[in-house]
């Protein structure tokens, strides 16, 4: 069940007064990083309620699970449930400045003809704009997007496959041979392979099968680097306030490339099932089901290229500037989609 559905289903009865107080508590915690009491709520947020009334409202919010006391203060901070309600119902996305718009445009105003370059730029840009870890993920490869394959003869026992996708992604794979092969045999093999691709008889996930099923020489197919790439920029920024053990766990998780890909693919599938029309999504670490990421949040947008979907976004501490971050990602996402659409049109003109 998504966070949106879960929250809305559990607290349909929250009053406007409770919303007002909850919004102030979460905003204060995100901004200051500290608990807040009834007097501060009245002074800082101009809430026209008595301190006694606010204390009663806070007690009700605590009973409902939206806020909690800390061990060191009588003030309150939001729980994960409070965060989720704030993000889905109360948060107003901040508009980005004209200077930020111009800075983003300057990054994307140069002609780019490969998705990989767009994603590299985007990962770096998002990390600079937000000071969080910028993330950009290619779409999961499907079985209908191979344009052609080139085989490069390295030596008698090694051939490199260069796989060109319809969206201009270029992948490489090393093919290890059981016994010697000549350049002429490699040329013959690439002709056979591309003929099958043109006839839709073989796709990206079948290339290994093509080699291993033939009476040929191939006995090993490297797959250390899966065909879906992702780019993470400024990962240390999200680890500043964590202890050494937690930092080690997070770094080890991000080093497991398969786990990372599965996480992002899961998010894409989840949004597809929800049929979400939101441009920017937020998921808290506890919703990811990954222990190493429980104290973090992921703010992201999904882009589309040729019917396949990928992700751009940032990962940072749970106490992050959501309003500003969501505004930035929303604008960057629009720029990325415009650039991809332009790239696709140029490609179609050449067909």
Curated annotation (Swiss-Prot):
InterPro entries: GAF-like_dom_sf, HrcA, HrcA_C, WH-like_DNA-bd_sf, WH_DNA-bd_sf, WHTH_transcript_rep_HrcA_IDD
Molecular function as annotated in GO: DNA binding
Keywords: Repressor, Stress response, Transcription, Transcription regulation
Gene3D superfamilies xref list: 3.30.450.40, Heat-inducible transcription repressor hrca homolog, domain 3 (3.30.390.60), Winged helix-like DNA-binding domain superfamily/Winged helix DNA-binding domain (1.10.10.10)
Domain of life: Bacteria
GO biological process: negative regulation of DNA-templated transcription
Chain's role: Negative regulator of class I heat shock genes (grpE-dnaK-dnaJ and groELS operons). Prevents heat-shock induction of these operons.
PANTHER family named among the record's database cross-references: HEAT-INDUCIBLE TRANSCRIPTION REPRESSOR HRCA
UniProt family annotation: Belongs to the HrcA family.
Protein's UniProt name: Heat-inducible transcription repressor HrcA
Gene name linked to the record: hrcA
